[in-house]
A protein has these predicted regions:
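Long, charged amphipathic helices and adjacent flexible linkers at domain junctions
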Residues: 276-293, 447-478, 586-633
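Short beta-alpha connecting loops at secondary-structure transitions
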Residues: 19, 338-343, 367, 408-421, ...
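A glycine-rich phosphate-binding loop feature that marks nucleotide/adenosyl-phosphate handling sites
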Residues: 177-184, 313-317, 373-378, 398-405, ...
Length: 709
């Protein structure tokens, strides 16, 4: 166990005490958000990512150790376990390395080599290794059933040697390192007709050293191969590898040459290639999943536009645009269908203008949220025209990815059983502006569309990572227990789908929950669930101000004592001044609290009911419309980062297609990844670098024209 902890400590840069604390709390049923927020003094203020890394690595090392024990036991049963082999297995850091060491002892299916051994050809194999002048003559002595001639017997003997040589652990390890450092992964066009949009054109004749392969290229090659467009291969320094293997023999003859050739080309290299491709894919998937997770986190943290009446606008050409007005709380007020763009007639378009203007006036619409899908550019122009008469109203282009998934879901049907799918989408688009987090948690995060090659990675690992991000953000922000949907509540630490639905049902039957203590009355919500969830649930209606903060009920008594010592009766300016000036270290000791816990309590008391998303960028509000034909190279624009990928970032500048900032145009300094400079949701100033009107593509730069010279 100590060695495992030492490995975790070494890899993650955490102390043995931190590891033990995290794993002990987890074993007791504590959730990651709870540990990160309410056990800082025990963990040394580890955040959610660090805590999850400890838990994940512990699980991975446990699986590795279990496999080592199983392998050692099987080799021991054969009586072939040496001290050197045991040590090599015990120090192996990868499962693949353990399997390589186990390979010579692994129970094999019936191979050519095993058949040859059973036929008694092993002595002939040994003769090949000696300087025998006439092997063919000697081989005649080994003719038997299945090996009717001396030539066939020699072939069987070669098979025995090929298997033995190809399982040489040292040679396989040397070959693996050689391929990793010097071999190239290649791709050739296999069937260009399957690549109608020429997405894979740059890979029709491609090669790159294995050790420098970028993750997005690995995933692109995998996809191209899967679609039948590309043929993937390797370029090796084969002669050098053959020379490695030849050093195992003291004599040279045609049979040994054959043994070396077959071992390398038929056995070892194909196995190493499979391993390398698996490792490249795993590394690429890990990077893609991390990137998607980072993008999702930033999207969920976009500042909400609270307290605004919003009109959701789901654009379409032929079937008409679906509109939905929601009040400041997100409650649907009305829905309507209009025909604002061609092929609608001129009369229909004029009627649509009047209908939109009437809705704005009747319901006091403050912002129009336009989905960025089909017909969004034309719809933006239409809305901008109408807003000339409403200078106080703005519009925003909203990323509608996943809105159609939500609108067709069981959750949406329960919420709006009498509405069409399209009208539900319009409501979702409007609500995304008011509270992105509350609305986006209703959608499978894989459908939100802020990733790269997300359909080409392990869906299980992707789901686990994205769910972790959603859980983390929801608990960091906190949830209003009286307004949250079951979908949002289910991400609160300690709560599951059943308990979340029970909370909503309890609200409907008993009215608003007025204190955290009352939450205990919800069916199926036991003591452990309450402990984990309570601090993340907010109750603005409570008479106890602490119920609308991140202060955990377990610390209410300490806070009362704090108020008593500081003579605080209300959280006015005088009280805030007292809280800011107190000595945390001394007061923490007096209250029997950890200093980190007291710091968090004070932060909550200084800003009760705070939403830390308010410190992030809000969406860009627009009143006019921009067309790609209006752009000129060198033009300065404001935009919002919509997606970050390995090679750059896509930015909404108010036209139909997002513009691309290539990584080379992000900084005057060298950067390894775009995420070092921008994040999803960032407001950025960009300059137009290149315009392709025909393909509707715009290249942007974060560097002013004079900075790129």
């Amino acid at each position: 166990m100590d060695k495992k902890y030492e490995k975790i400590s070494q890899d993650l840069g955490v102390t043995l005490k931190q590891i033990d604390t995290v794993l002990s709390l987890t074993a007791e049923g504590a959730t990651i958000p709870f540990i990160a927020r309410y056990r800082k003094d025990m963990t040394g203020s580890l955040d959610e990512v660090a805590i999850k890394a400890i838990i994940d690595l512990d699980k991975s090392l446990t699986n590795l150790n279990d496999r080592k024990e199983a392998v050692l036991a099987k080799i021991q049963e054969q009586g072939k376990l040496t001290k050197e082999l045991e040590e090599a297995i015990l120090v192996a850091e990868k499962l693949a390395d353990v399997e390589e060491l186990y390979l010579p002892y692994k129970e094999k299916r019936r191979t050519k080599a095993t058949i040859a051994r059973e036929a008694g050809l092993f002595p002939l194999a040994r003769l090949i290794l000696q300087n025998i002048v006439d092997l063919e003559k000697e081989a005649e002595k080994f003719v038997c059933e299945g090996f009717a001639t001396g030539k066939e017997a020699l072939t069987g003997a070669v098979d025995i040697l090929v298997e033995a040589l190809s399982e040489d652990v040292t040679l396989r390890s040397m070959t693996y390192q050689e391929v990793l450092r010097h071999s190239k992964l290649t791709s050739q066009a296999k069937d260009e007709s399957l690549d109608e949009k020429q997405v894979f054109q740059i890979y029709y004749d491609f090669s790159e050293t294995v050790g420098t392969m970028q993750g997005y290229r690995t995933l692109a090659l995998n996809r191209g191969e899967k679609l039948g467009v590309l043929k993937i291969g390797f370029e090796h320094a084969t002669d050098r590898i053959l020379a490695f293997f030849a050093t195992r023999f003291k004599v040279k003859n045609a049979y040994i040459d054959e043994v070396v050739q077959q071992s390398v080309k038929k056995k070892v290299l194909p196995a190493i290639e499979r391993r390398i491709r698996t490792e490249l894919t795993e590394k690429a998937e890990e990077g893609a999943i991390q990137l998607f997770s980072d993008n999702l986190r930033n999207l969920l943290l976009v500042a909400p536009l609270k307290g605004r009446v919003v009109l959701g606008f789901d654009p379409a050409f032929r079937t008409g645009a679906k509109l939905a007005v929601v009040d400041a709380t997100g409650k649907m007020l009305t829905t309507q269908v209009i025909y604002p763009v061609k092929p609608a007639s001129a009369r229909q378009i004029e009627e649509a203008k009047k209908d939109l203007a009437d809705l704005i006036g009747q319901y006091g619409v403050e912002i129009i949220a336009i989905g960025n899908g089909t017909a969004s550019r034309e719809s933006g122009a239409f809305v901008a025209e109408v807003l000339k008469d409403f200078p106080e109203v703005s519009y925003v282009i909203v990323n509608e990815s996943g809105a159609s998934v939500y609108s067709a879901s069981e959750l949406a049907r329960q919420e709006f059983p009498d509405l069409t799918v399209e009208k539900r989408s319009a409501i979702s688009i409007a609500r995304r502006l008011q509270d992105p987090l509350a609305e986006l948690v209703k959608i499978d995060p894989k459908s939100i569309g802020v990733g790269q090659y997300q359909h080409d990675v392990s869906q299980k690992k992707l789901s686990e990572s994205l769910d972790f991000v959603v859980d983390t953000v929801v608990n960091q922000v906190g949830v209003n227990v009286n307004t949250a949907s079951p979908a949002l509540l289910s991400h609160v630490a300690g709560l599951n789908k059943t308990i979340s639905e029970n909370i909503v049902k309890y609200r409907e039957e008993e009215g608003k929950i007025t204190s955290r203590a009352q939450i205990k009355k919800v069916p199926r919500l036991g003591a452990k669930a309450f402990e984990q969830a309570a601090g993340f649930l907010r109750i603005p209606e409570s008479s106890n101000i602490l119920d609308n903060t991140g202060v955990h009920p377990e610390n209410y008594t300490a806070v009362k004592e704090l108020f008593k010592r500081l003579d605080i009766k209300d959280l006015n300016e005088e009280a805030q001044s007292k809280l800011k000036s107190l000595s945390v270290k001394e007061m923490a000791q007096e209250l029997d609290l950890g200093p980190e816990t007291l710091k968090d309590i004070i932060a909550d008391l200084l800003k009760p009911g705070r939403d830390f998303r308010d410190s992030f960028d809000a969406p860009v509000l627009r009143q006019d419309v921009l067309d790609i034909k209006d752009l000129v190279v060198g033009q300065k624009l404001e935009g919002v980062v919509r997606n970050v990928v390995d090679f750059g970032a896509f930015v909404d500048i108010g036209i139909h297609e997002d513009g691309l900032i290539h990584i080379s145009h992000m900084s005057r300094k060298f950067i390894k990844h775009p995420s070092q400079v921008v994040s999803v949701g960032d407001l950025v100033t960009v300059w137009v670098k290149k315009i392709d009107t025909e393909r509707e593509k715009v290249n942007l730069s974060l560097l002013a024209p004079n900075e790129t010279d």
